[in-house]
Amino acid sequence: IRGRRVLRVPVRRRGVRPLPVSATGADDVIVVVGMDCRFPGGSSSPEAYWDFLCSGADGVVPVPYDRWDSDVYYDPDVDQPHKTYAYEAGFISGVEYFDNAFFGISESEAGQMDPQQRVMLEVGYGALAAAGLGKERLVGEGVGVFVGCCNDDFKSLAPAGGKAIGVYTATSGDVAILANRISFSLGLKGPSMTINTACSSSLVALDVAMLQLRSGSCRAALVGGVNLLLSVEGFIATSKARMLSPTGRCRTFSVDADGYCRGEGCGAVVLK
């Protein structure tokens, strides 16, 4: 990205034999032809994300007040009911904004859509556009859409009693519709599925997309993943399980590791 060279250092694990190059024919080679992303730290493009990584920053910030009031739910005592000892995470900004007219979606429907659908649609289209596939070229094309997602915070925000249930509720708040929303909005005719395998959802979506490409089920594949932290409930649940880091930092493989830090983000790649 931007002229920087990344050196890949081969690592040989004991007891693991590398796959022979001849095991994959030239016709089976799959390449990334487009990508887009939105990550914490203002990383709204692959180039911005690369610069952010090189800066050494981590993007972890206090919980914004437009999500929930951390002062109400924070307590360092893990045994306190309906409290979380985590008050920081990696958040992306602007999830409330959406260009609904560009995608032919009414304001009333857009207002009831899970923000994860909106962000995934924008980032997914950004990846397709980066691959040279604008809206006019996509209609009717056999492009598959494979989205990994395991978070449905949006449902927990609905008021009790069904008062907010409307004509778009069934499709606008269901995680299963994430991939279908992209396919429908852009007129894509390939396979379309949302995959939930918890933390590995996006990786499994990538694996399924490659299998579908090789089987001929689609000519190209849009693969993405999205995660937005819209409710405090997930923080409370993972705090009770003592999964979260009290210091708000991931220190993987370190003796100082004390849990993990939650984070938002959305990424997409186009495979051919």
Where are these regions (language model features)?
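Phosphopantetheine-dependent thiolation modules in NRPS/PKS and related acyl-activating systems
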Residues: I1-P18
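Cys-dependent condensing catalytic cores that perform Claisen condensation/acyl-transfer
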Residues: V21-D256
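Channel- or pocket-lining gating/hinge segments that regulate access to a cavity or pore
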Residues: Y85, V255-K272
